[in-house]
Amino acid sequence: MGLGSRSAKQRMHSDFEPHPDAEMCTACNRCVTWCPVDAIVIGPDRVAEVDYELCYGCGECVAACPFGAIAIAWKTEPASIQEKIVEHVAGVLKDKPGKIVYLSFITNVTPDCDCWHFSDAPVVADIGVLASTDIVAIDQAAYDLVTAAKGLAGTKGEGLAEGADKFQEMSGIDGTVAMEYAERKGVGVRTYELKTLA
């Protein structure tokens, strides 16, 4: 996502629309403050209103609302967004084989998207840093390590045992779709060998 232009991010997220609930909205203005494209205003009836021409579906408003008043309305399955992200990644990497080393810092693992300007408490203890020349293998390894970790007490990960898919449990979304699709597209492979350095 980091290398995607604003228009590319909009295309990746185009299947998502936030819908404020008039009954639950308190007009606290938090969603307005957090919207990166100023697509939300508090309307005359004191309810958040979204300009869908400006909104690119980042979801910051959903996470920012302390009252849960903004629902996620997907036009298609979340797997579609994961596949779109992989398509963009494949485009960025196609002319760079063997020229990139990937680092994955498995620290402060958040329950929600880390592209937002805020976060909740980490859901597992810090695990460490991974390095690889294969973007898919490093993602799979990181995913597996988080899955193998125990959820931290007092967080959204509380009660999630070692071996439980933390991301699936917290979001209801299968996070392996992107890695499976990337492997099918030839972006990388999901198999890996972990070598621990002291």
Where do the model's predicted regions map?
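Extended, low-polarity segments enriched in aliphatic/aromatic residues
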Residues: 1-198
